[in-house]
UniProtKB/Swiss-Prot annotation:
Reaction equations catalysed: (2R,3S)-3-isopropylmalate + NAD(+) = 4-methyl-2-oxopentanoate + CO2 + NADH
Function description: Catalyzes the oxidation of 3-carboxy-2-hydroxy-4-methylpentanoate (3-isopropylmalate) to 3-carboxy-4-methyl-2-oxopentanoate. The product decarboxylates to 4-methyl-2 oxopentanoate.
Keyword ATP-binding: no
The protein's annotated pathway: Amino-acid biosynthesis; L-leucine biosynthesis; L-leucine from 3-methyl-2-oxobutanoate: step 3/4
Listed name of the protein: 3-isopropylmalate dehydrogenase
Residues annotated as binding NAD(+): 75-88, 288-300
Top-level taxon of the source organism: Bacteria
Family: Belongs to the isocitrate and isopropylmalate dehydrogenases family. LeuB type 1 subfamily.
UniProt cross-references to InterPro entries, sorted A to Z: IsoCit/isopropylmalate_DH_CS, IsoPropMal-DH-like_dom, Isopropylmalate_DH
Keyword Endoplasmic reticulum: no
Enzyme superclass (EC): oxidoreductase
Length: 367
């Protein structure tokens, strides 16, 4: 029997997690998956309860679990505390401690939401791209880092961006193999676009060269292209459907995946997976804790529900259950139900609903 650790976290985390758990329990019963759910603390609520953003008990339970489902962490309540104790440090630590090096973010536009995007329909209709982000290296984890006082009394902040060939090869393999899988399913040619700033950063010059060597030695059937990060930001808006799989480092991936989220109409629609080398993972929505709307029953639970779908697909290899959730989400959108973030007030026949009503509507499609 497999175990899933749920970590609701802060802000809207508990609201969206409640809906995701209901959906998970439904598919667990319907497909006889044999999954057991546990819960734990992370982020600000963990700081309030234990003094630590990632309590040792939570970390040990996460290590023992087969997968982790996360809501959201952080909020202004904890902005003034010591940096090492802030909620976001718990998220960084659990990723690092579990070896979750590969972050997968799917930017898929549901046809029902084409008018919710700020981009012209002809540019984004049919969008389905995957961003593979290296998650445990780069400038977010590089040492040395800190804030120091210079001899003249001025303060200076500094960080280090560093990648080894083994780290680059590891994330590259994930990207190339996912491109092969996606191409086989779609009946298209496999392609990967590697994002760097090799023109100014030596670390990404190594990134680019390592990707080239990996493709030539092991993945010659996958077309590999390269793009500077600043141009990639522009091209995502200009012509997003030119991409299938994008692979990049931690910092650029953080920026590009949030940009890609808005192509779909709302970051509230985007799930993500963070995987280790064995396929064990942590699954979470791409959005943050949104403390400004917490407790108001207006958050969009669909990204978290779709994160459950990704979990079933990538960790538990339950494709039928994963597709059932995705179809249920699509059916609810067909019914015209919209949370406020994806509501087009100029489109007739739409029904504004809250977090709970949206989640229960998806659940009803699965029962």
């Amino acid at each position: 029997m497999a175990t899933i650790l749920t970590l609701a976290g802060d802000g809207i985390g508990p609201e969206i997690m409640t809906q995701a758990i209901d959906v998970l329990n439904a598919v667990n019963d319907k497909f006889a998956l044999g999954l057991t759910l546990e819960s734990g603390l992370i982020g600000g609520v963990a700081v309030d309860s234990t003094g630590e953003p990632l309590p040792e008990e939570t970390l040990q339970r996460a290590r023992a679990a087969d997968a982790v489902l996360l809501g959201a962490v952080g909020g202004p309540k904890w902005d003034g505390i010591e940096r090492s104790k802030r909620p976001e440090r718990g998220l960084l630590k659990i990723r690092s401690e579990l070896g979750l090096f590969a972050n997968l973010r799917v930017a898929k536009l549901y046809p029902q939401l084409v008018n919710a995007s700020s981009i012209k329909p002809e540019i984004i209709s049919g969008l389905d791209l995957l961003i593979v982000r290296e998650l445990t290296g780069g400038i977010y984890f590089g040492e040395p880092r800190g804030i120091r006082t210079l001899e003249n009394g001025e303060q200076q902040g500094y960080n280090t961006m560093v990648y080894s060939t083994s780290e680059i090869n590891r994330i590259g393999k994930v990207a190339f193999e996912l491109a092969q899988t996606r191409a086989q399913a779609a009946g298209t040619a496999a392609k990967v676009c590697s994002i760097d700033k090799a023109n100014v950063l030596e670390v990404t010059e190594l990134w680019k060269q390592t990707m080239i060597e990996l493709q030539q030695s092991e993945y010659s059937d996958v077309a590999l292209s390269h793009m500077y990060a600043d141009n990639a930001c522009m091209q995502l808006i200009k012509d997003p459907k030119q991409f299938d799989v994008m692979v990049t480092g931690n910092l650029f991936g953080d920026i590009l995946s949030d940009e890609a989220a808005m192509l779909t109409g709302s970051i509230g629609m985007l799930p993500s997976a963070s995987l280790d080398e064995a396929g064990k993972g942590m699954y979470e929505p791409c959005h943050g804790s949104a403390p400004d709307i917490a407790g108001q029953d207006i958050a969009n639970p669909l990204a978290t529900i779709l994160s459950v779908s990704m979990m079933l697909r990538y960790t538990f290899k339950q494709e039928a259950a994963a597709q059932a959730i995705e179809q249920a989400v699509s059916d609810v959108l067909d019914d015209g139900l919209r949370t406020v973030d994806i509501l087009d007030r100029n489109e007739a026949g739409l029904i504004q609903v809250g977090c709970q009503q949206m989640g229960q509507a998806v659940l009803a499609k699965l029962i």
